Amino acid sequence: MTQRRPSGTTLAVALLALVFALFFLFPFAGLVWRAMDDPRAREALGDPAVGTALRLSLVTTAVSVTLSLLFGTPVAYLLARCRIPGGAVLDALLDLPIVLPPTVAGVALLTAFGRRGLLGEPIEALTGFSLPFTALAVIVAQTFVAAPLYVRAARAGFEAVDPELEAIARTLGASRAHVFRRITVPLARGPLLAGAVLCWARALGELGATLIFAGNLAGRTQTLPLAVVAAFEGGPLGLPGAVALSLVLLAVALVLLMTLRIVAKRGLA
C-alpha cells in the first residue's frame, strides 16, 4: 500500500503552524536564555525583594481564590439552576471585568472604594480605615478581575449536571444542602477545579487594576507582576531583576497550566 504524499495545502498549513508556534516559543526561550546567560539575573533571583514579592503574590492569590470560591460557587449554581429577576444583568456584570481593560477595573475600584469613593468615603468616616494602597486592596483587585472566570467555569459545570439526579435525591429525603454537597459538586468537580486554577492564574498575573487601586509599594502591595514593572522602569533590581522575576512568573504559570491539564483530564475521566 503506497503512502499518499502530503499535498501543497497540507505543507502550507504545516508551515504556517510552525511559524505561529515559533512566534510564541522564541520570547519565552529568549527569557530563559537571558536569565541563564546574565549572571546578574541569576544573582537577582536570590534578592530578598524577589522572595517578598513572591510571598505576597502567593498569599494574596490564595485569599482571593478562596473568596472567589466561597462567593462564586453559590452565584454560579444560582445562575445555572434558577431564573431570577435581574439574572441577565448579573450575568452581564460578571462579564465586564473579563472584557474591560484591567486599568479601567482599577479606576472603577478606586471610585467605589477610594477615600472619596462611593463607599470608601463613608467607610473611612465610620471606621477610619482606608482600603486603597493596602494588601487588602491587592486581594480586592485580584478577586474583582479573577472571580468571574471561576463563576463562568462553575456555571458550565453545574449546567452539565442532570437536574433529574438532584430531584431523585430530594424525593428520597435528602436535603438541598446534602444533594449539593454529595451529588452536584462531585459531578461538577472537573469544571470547578479547572475554574479555580484559571482564577488563580488570572489573579497571579493581575497588574493594571492592582497598580491603580493598591499601588506598587515594595513589601506592602508589590506583587510579582508589579515588581517586574518596577525593576524594568529603573528599580534597584534593574533589567536583570525584571528578567529574573519574569522567569519566576513563567515557572509558576507552567505549574498552573500543567495542573489545569491534569484536572481537566481527571474531570473528564
Regions from the PLM with identified roles:
Residues 2-11, 29-66, 78-87, 230-240:
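Periplasmic/extracellular loop-to-transmembrane helix junction in inner-membrane transport proteins
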Residues 2-3, 39, 87, 106-143, ...:
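Membrane-interfacial helix termini and adjacent extracytoplasmic/periplasmic loops
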Residues 2-13, 23-27, 86, 152-166, ...:
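C-terminal transmembrane helix and the adjacent membrane-cytosol boundary/short C-terminal tail
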Residues 4, 43, 63-94, 107, ...:
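Transmembrane-helix boundary motif in ABC transporter permease subunits
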Residues 4-10, 41-42, 48, 211-255, ...:
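Interhelical loop and adjacent transmembrane-helix boundary motif
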Residues 15-16, 21, 66, 96, ...:
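Transmembrane alpha-helices
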Residues 22, 55, 59-71, 75, ...:
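Hydrophobic alpha-helical transmembrane segments of multipass integral membrane proteins
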Residues 27, 191-230:
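Non-cytoplasmic
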